[in-house]
């Protein structure tokens, strides 16, 4: 993503909006392999997508996904004695995640072909 000088402020704002728009899809995708708790979801997203989320961001998203019947949640005792709330996709959540993934891939492929000339020019300028 963009650097942090004043010249890139507009790009940074755009990137922040892009991340916000993708969070629900990213959380559903992070839950696709199986059940997970909040901090684990945060780590998964950071590792795979460079999305850095706080607990104050992830839990409202998870609650909204629960209200929309896209995820289920269950409290489970952990080895440390502190219960953890594990989230998993519902059937509806799996269907929604698959639809979002398909739409995203089509969108990203189209944009990639559109952006390629811009990237080629930038690469050529570095040589």
How would you name each of these model-derived features?
Residues 79-101:
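Basic, amphipathic "hinge/linker" alpha-helix immediately C-terminal to the N-terminal HTH DNA-binding motif
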Residues 59-66:
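Short, hydrophobic-biased segments on the C-terminal half of alpha helices
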Residues 15-59:
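N-terminal helix-turn-helix DNA-binding core of bacterial DNA-binding proteins
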């Amino acid at each position: 993503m963009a650097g942090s000088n004043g010249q890139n402020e507009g790009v940074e704002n755009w990137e922040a909006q892009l991340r916000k728009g993708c969070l629900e899809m990213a959380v559903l995708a992070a839950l696709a392999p199986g059940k997970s708790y909040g901090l684990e979801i945060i780590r998964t997203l950071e590792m795979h997508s460079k999305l850095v989320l706080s607990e104050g961001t992830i839990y409202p998203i998870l609650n909204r996904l629960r209200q929309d019947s896209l995820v289920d949640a269950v409290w489970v005792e952990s080895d440390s004695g502190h219960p953890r709330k594990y989230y998993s996709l519902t059937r509806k959540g799996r269907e929604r995640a698959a639809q979002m993934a398909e739409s995203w891939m089509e969108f990203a492929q189209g944009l990639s072909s559109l952006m390629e000339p811009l990237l080629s020019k930038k690469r050529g300028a570095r040589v």
